[in-house]
Structures are given as C-alpha cells and as structure tokens.
Amino acid sequence: MTSLTLFDTMARRKRDFEPTDPGRVTMYVCGPTVYSYAHIGNARPAVVFDTLFRVLRRLYGEDQVIYARNITDVDDKIIETARESGKPIEDITSHYADIYRADMGALGVTLPTIEPHATDHIPEMIGMVQNLVYSGHAYEADGHVLFDVSSYEKYGRLSNRDLDDMIAGARVEVASYKRSPADFVLWKPAKDDEPGWDSPWGRGRPGWHLECSAMSEKHLGKTIDIHGGGTDLVFPHHENEIAQSVCAHKGAPMANYWLHNGFLTMGTDKMSKSLGNVQLVHDLIKDYPGEVLRYALLTAHYRAPLTWTADLLAKTRRSLDRIYGVLRRLGEIEAAPSDVPPAFLEALHDDLNTPKALSELFQLAGNANKALSDVEKAQAKGELLAAAGMLGLGQADPDAWFGLTDLDPAERARIDDLIVRRQTAREEKDWPTADAVRDELNALKVQVDDGPEGSTWRKLD
C-alpha cells in the first residue's frame, strides 16, 4: 500500500506523513467564529479535513486519531452581533454553534474528537501570555499585551514573507503602543459592556491568534502532527500562532505538517461575507441534498480554487444519480464485506487527490453495473460502498435518494415498466416509441436521466 503524502505549506512540497506517535495521531483545524450562518466557503475546510480524518482513522485506527476543531465564541464580530440584536453573547454563540454542527452534519461532516470553546480556556491563555512576557517575547503597553515579533527570528517562514518588507509595506495606521507595526495583540483590555476576564494586566480578553495556540496545546500537546485551515489563515493567523507557540515552548515546533485548502470563488472573487457574495449552507440544504454539496466540494483538489456555480451542482447531482442508480439496480443484493480498493486508496493517499478518487469511484460503479453473478454483484457493491464511504458519499437509501419511498407499489411498478419499455425502444432505435413513453413519464411527473450505467429516474414533487 502506498504511504500517505501531504503537501506541507511550511516545506512547500509534498512529504510522506509520519506521525510522532502512530498510537496518537493529532490534528487541529481552525473552526468557526459563531456569530452568523456558515457559507459554503466555510464548509470547504470542514469537508476537506473531515475527509482527511476518515483517511487517518482508516490508517491508524478510529481511536488513535485525535481531531480538534475549535469554536471561537469571543470575538469583535460576536460582540457587535450581540449589541445589534440585544441578545446575550452566550445565546448568540450557542445558537450559531448548534446551527453550524447541524449544517455540517447535513454535508456528512462527522463531529471532531474534541470541540474546544475559546471561553473555556481563558486560564490556559493567560498562562501562555505570562510565559511569553517572562521570557521576553511579549510586552505590556497601554493595557494591551503584545507579541514582540522581532524576538522570533523565523517569523514569516510559513507565509514566505520578509519581516522588513511587511513593516515597510504596512498601510494601516499603527497603534501608538506598538513597538513595531508587525507586533500583534495577545491580550486586549475589555470595555465595560464587553466580555472580559481578570488577568495580571487588568480585565480583558484574548487575541484571536492566542486562542488556537492555547487550545491546541491543552488538548493535543505542544507539538502536534497536523494543523489545518483555509489558505486565508496562512497569514497572519497561522504565522502568529507559530510565533507565540514556538516561543512559549522553548523552540518546539507547533505542528509538523501545515495543510491549507484553497478558496471557494464566485466568478473571479473569493466568496466572503465582506464582499456580500456568499451562499449559506443553511439555505443551500433546503434546495439540494447535503451529499450534493459535499460531492461538489470534493470535485477540485483541496489546494486548488473551486468556482461555485449552479452548473457545478447540477452536474454533481447527476453524478450521484449514477452511483445511486447502480446501487438501486443491485437491489436486495447484500454487499460483501470488502476493503477499499487499492487504486482508490492510492488517489486519496496522494495528498487527498479527491478528483482522482471520484474517477476511481465511477470505475467501481461501472464494475458493479457490469457484474453478472450474485457473488460478483455482492463483491462489487461492497467495494463501491467502502470507497464511497471514505468520501462520506453513497450511504443514503437509493429509493430515498430518488424520492421513491412514499410511492404506491402499483404506481412504482407502472413507472418501472415504462422505463423498461423506453430503454428497449432506445436500444432498437425506435425513437417515436421512446419519445411517446417519455411523454407518459413526464405526465406522471417522473424525471428520467440517461447515463453510461443506464437510466435513472426520480419522482418530482
């Protein structure tokens, strides 16, 4: 079996994955800031790293992989949302955290092993800041505690930026209490109407970068195997996480592998709330099965940009119809216990090459469709389901997928008969009969789609 290779942003190349302890593989991924609904761009890292989570658990064992994805529940945007709504911050954060879990669950995203909340880790954050102050890597100024970027000589290595160039290119007004424009906030004073906690520097709250460093250390250790997130987090968030964690831990690396997924775009623009070009997962799942959205997010390599369009979703649905059409035709054949086929695994082990894995999945669907004996069908069905499951796909009931579960048996038998008649007419090139049967099916509100594995149909509302 091929080894797992992953593209490490720090090394700027693919590397064989070698966990520090195969009995305890650790992964931390930056999760949502819960002040509003998640858009489909926010769902991309959730789906990407859920897929990696599945791969790692298959390689090392379900109980040997510890995956932490945090919840940021203290933030300027959260505070502003609470002010505008007149609701307590705790109500805002718990409400949107619940919706986030439900929306991601609809996309087949499994829950992480650990879901730490920032506000549950204030003592750890204060302790890390104290450590940085005592060791000369941070300083107090005007009620703030800031990280002294000049004290960490490798700052900018992850994002491949030069510190002097960053300082020279600073275009925003620099706070007077900063020694350098590049210094960033570890702890900030809290206003009377803002959430705050007592600290050696007065009542305040943590900076965003500090939160992830403290939570990662608390639950996974000083050096973890994998740290992931969107490419927009490389700088400044992950760069700052590295600086404060390495300096707090006497030079120990924060993570051995840094993984970043590409942007989701609408046209030529990155999808973002600030640009107002977002599509909310909460809305999309009203019009599409969550599996369609998940599949669409996997059609491009995770490091590449992905353009989100209605055409992409239409193609994705047709692709899933082909897979479920094969599973439906296999009917009552019980899937044989099967391992994931090697060619499919090879694609996933090559830096999560999901486009290649999806291509292999359709090869398996074709094999299942061509199987003749019940033994061959059972084996092919088992392999198809095992591979699809690695991607979080193909686990729904085929009849439910096509909207057939509530059909009267007599009506279903009639439709099946019409489908067979139309297929026979098409094979005999009797186009008038085929068209006439299709008209009958349209009158019954039946949508027929023809594909390489045969025709599939669904009952329309």
From Swiss-Prot:
One of its GO terms (molecular function) is ATP binding. A motif ('KMSKS' region) lies at residues 270-274. Gene3D superfamilies: Cysteine-tRNA ligase, C-terminal anti-codon recognition domain, HUPs. It is found in: Cytoplasm. InterPro entries: Cys-tRNA-ligase, Cys-tRNA-synt_Ia_DALR, Cys-tRNA/MSH_ligase, CysS_C, Rossmann-like_a/b/a_fold, tRNA-synt_1_cat_dom, tRNAsynth_Ia_anticodon-bd. Zn(2+) binds at C30, C212, H237, E241. The keyword Cell division does not apply. Its cofactor is Zn(2+). The keyword Aminoacyl-tRNA synthetase applies. A motif ('HIGH' region) lies at residues 32-42. NCBIfam families: cysS. Belongs to the class-I aminoacyl-tRNA synthetase family. HAMAP family: Cys_tRNA_synth. This is Cysteine--tRNA ligase. It comes from Maricaulis maris (strain MCS10).
